[in-house]
C-alpha cells in the first residue's frame, strides 16, 4: 500500500514540445463519489478515490495522453459476474468467518480490475494507435541517466474490507532524451489471488511515436507456495512470479500534420 500524503500539489515539466503535468489533491467528497458511482452504474467506488488526480502528457499542438481514475473505472468490466462470483466464493472459503459471503458476492466487479491504458487527448489532432512487434528497450532504461523529473500519482485504492488491496497508480520519470511512464493496477485478495495490469509508455525525443506495452499477470495464491509471503505485498518483487495472461504492444503515432500554431486543446473522451 502506498503512503498517502494529502498535501495538494501541481507540477509541470517541459520536455521539448511536450508539457508533462502531475496534479495531486484530496480524495473525492462523498457527494461527488455517489454521483460518479451512479454515472458509472456501480454500487460503490474505491474507498480512496482521487477523482481530480491526473498525470498528463500533452504536445503543444494539443494531442497527447493522460491518466485519471474516472476513465480507469469506465474500463472495469461489470459483466463478468461468473468469474467474480467464483473468486468471491474462493475468498469466502479462505475465511474462517462465514459472514462475508453476502458482502463480497455483488453484481459488479468489487475488485475494480481495469485494463485502462490511458485517455487520448485532442480533437482534430490525435495519437494514432497501431499494433506493433516493437518492444520497449529495457536495457536503455537500465542505463544510468540523470532524472530530470519524477512524479507518482495515486488514482484510487481500496483495502477490500481489510482482506487485500486494489490500487491504481501512475508514475513517470524524464531523462535528458526520453521519458518512461508506468501505470499499474495491483490487486491482492488475501488467500486467493494476485493480479497486476501494467501499462508502460516510452518515448525518445527523436522519434515520432511512443511505444506502449500492456501486460496482465495473475496467479492464485495456491500456486505461489514457493514464494515468500512477504513478497505478496511488494508489486515490484512479486511480478516475476506471476504468469502473463495477456500482452499487447502498440505504437502511439503522432499526427502527420502538427499544428504550427497550437490552439487550446480540448480533452477527448476516447479511453484506451
Curated annotation (Swiss-Prot):
Q: What is the effect of changing residue 196 to V?
A: Abolishes interaction with PPP2CA, PPP2CB and PPP4C
According to the record, mutating residue 198 to N results in: Abolishes interaction with PPP2CA, PPP2CB and PPP4C
**According to the UniProt record, where is the region Interaction with PPP2CA?**
173-272
**Subcellular location, in the record's words?**
Cytoplasm
- PTM sites of type N6-acetyllysine: 106
Superkingdom of this protein's organism: Eukaryota
Respond yes or no to whether keyword Acetylation is given for this record.
yes
Sorted keywords for this record are: Acetylation, Cytoplasm, Phosphoprotein
Report the GO molecular function annotations.
Answer: protein phosphatase activator activity; protein phosphatase inhibitor activity
| GO BP terms, alphabetized | DNA damage checkpoint signaling; TOR signaling
By its UniProt entry, which InterPro entries does this protein fall under? Phosphatase_reg/MetRdx, TIP41-like
- A single Gene Ontology CC term: cytosol
From which residue to which does any coiled coil extend?
Answer: none
Residue numbers of Phosphoserine PTMs: 265
Q: State the oligomer form and interacting partners.
A: Isoform 1 interacts with PPP2CA. Isoform 2 does not interact with PPP2CA. Interacts with PPP2CB, PPP4C and PPP6C. Interacts with IGBP1; the interaction is dependent on PPP2CA. Associates with a protein phosphatase 2A PP2A(C):IGBP1 complex. Interacts with PPP4C and PPP4R2.
What task does this protein carry out? May be a allosteric regulator of serine/threonine-protein phosphatase 2A (PP2A). Isoform 1 inhibits catalytic activity of the PP2A(D) core complex in vitro. The PP2A(C):TIPRL complex does not show phosphatase activity. May play a role in the regulation of ATM/ATR signaling pathway controlling DNA replication and repair.
Family to which the UniProt record says this protein belongs:
Belongs to the TIP41 family.
- UniProt cross-references to PANTHER family, sorted A to Z: GAF/PUTATIVE CYTOSKELETAL PROTEIN, TIP41-LIKE PROTEIN
Protein name as annotated: TIP41-like protein
Say which species the protein is native to.
Homo sapiens
Amino acid at each position: 500500500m502506498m503512503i498517502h500524503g494529502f498535501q495538494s500539489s501541481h507540477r509541470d515539466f517541459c520536455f521539448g514540445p511536450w508539457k508533462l503535468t502531475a496534479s495531486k489533491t484530496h480524495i473525492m467528497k462523498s457527494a461527488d463519489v455517489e454521483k460518479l458511482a451512479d454515472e458509472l452504474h456501480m454500487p460503490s467506488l474505491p474507498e480512496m478515490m482521487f477523482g481530480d488526480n491526473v498525470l498528463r502528457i500533452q504536445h503543444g499542438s494539443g494531442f497527447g495522453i493522460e491518466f485519471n481514475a474516472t476513465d480507469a473505472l469506465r474500463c472495469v468490466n461489470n459483466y463478468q459476474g461468473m468469474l467474480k462470483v467464483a473468486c468471491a466464493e474462493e475468498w469466502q472459503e479462505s475465511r474462517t468467518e462465514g459472514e462475508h459471503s453476502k458482502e463480497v458476492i455483488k453484481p459488479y466487479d468489487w475488485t475494480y480490475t481495469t485494463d485502462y491504458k490511458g485517455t487520448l487527448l485532442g480533437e482534430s489532432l490525435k495519437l494514432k494507435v497501431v499494433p506493433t512487434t516493437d518492444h520497449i528497450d529495457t536495457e536503455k532504461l537500465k542505463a544510468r541517466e540523470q532524472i530530470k523529473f519524477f512524479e507518482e500519482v495515486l488514482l484510487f485504492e481500496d483495502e477490500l474490507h481489510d482482506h487485500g488491496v486494489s490500487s491504481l497508480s501512475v508514475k513517470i520519470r524524464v531523462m535528458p532524451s526520453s521519458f518512461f511512464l508506468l501505470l499499474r493496477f495491483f490487486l491482492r485478495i488475501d488467500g486467493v489471488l494476485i493480479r497486476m495490469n501494467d501499462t508502460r509508455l516510452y518515448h525518445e525525443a527523436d522519434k515520432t511515436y511512443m511505444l506502449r506495452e500492456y501486460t496482465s499477470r495473475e496467479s492464485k495464491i495456491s500456486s505461489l507456495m514457493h514464494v515468500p509471503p512477504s513478497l505478496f505485498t511488494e508489486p515490484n518483487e512479486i511480478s516475476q512470479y506471476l504468469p502473463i495472461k495477456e500482452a499487447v504492444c502498440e505504437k502511439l503515432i503522432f499526427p502527420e500534420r502538427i499544428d504550427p500554431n497550437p490552439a487550446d486543446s480540448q480533452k477527448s473522451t476516447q479511453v484506451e
